[in-house]
Design a protein with these regions (language model features):
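Short acidic/glycine-enriched loop/turn segments that link adjacent beta-strands
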Residues: 30-33, 92
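Short, charged, amphipathic alpha-helix that recurs within catalytic cores of restriction-modification
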Residues: 53-81
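Short secondary-structure boundary/capping segments within folded domains
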Residues: 26-30, 37-41, 76
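Domain-level recognition of nuclease-like catalytic cores that cleave nucleotide substrates
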Residues: 72, 77-109
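Acidic-basic catalytic patches of nuclease active cores, encompassing PD-(D/E)XK
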Residues: 1-27
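Structural signal for conserved beta-strand scaffold positions within catalytic alpha/beta enzyme cores
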Residues: 26, 49, 84-86
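Conserved catalytic cores of phosphodiester-cleaving nucleases, focusing on short active-site segments
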Residues: 15, 36-38, 43-54
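A structural micro-motif
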Residues: 22-23, 45, 80
Length: 109
């Protein structure tokens, strides 16, 4: 199993529960960078990127910041939300933190 798959699987289950199976699309395009697109009544409403770490806090690497910039730009074009779902470990348990992509790219967009 590849790194991060468990976090993506957990995230997909939560998104399907919230938005319905037909409205959650797994994206497999490397150059774009996001993991999931969320639709509602034929309109794109959210772009979700999933990140995982074995530490308590996740800090994006320069390559990941560039990926987040692309996601943010895409979300601006399509007028939708862009979120990072961050799975961290706390005392052996996985915890989820949901943040706006904009928080991590600051004024760099």
């Amino acid at each position: 199993m590849r790194k991060g798959y468990g976090d993506e699987y957990r995230t997909k289950q939560m998104l399907v529960e919230q938005y319905g199976k037909d409205n959650v699309i797994k994206v497999a395009i490397g150059s774009f960078g996001a993991d999931f697109l969320i639709l509602n009544k034929g309109k794109l409403v959210k772009v979700v990127e999933v990140k995982g770490t074995r530490k308590k806090v996740w800090y994006p690497l320069p390559r990941e910041k560039e990926q987040l910039r692309r996601i943010f730009h895409f979300s601006q074009i399509h007028e939708c939300e862009a979120e990072v779902w961050i799975w961290t470990k706390n005392r052996g348990k996985k915890e989820l933190r949901i943040e706006s992509v904009e928080k991590f790219i600051g004024g760099d967009a």
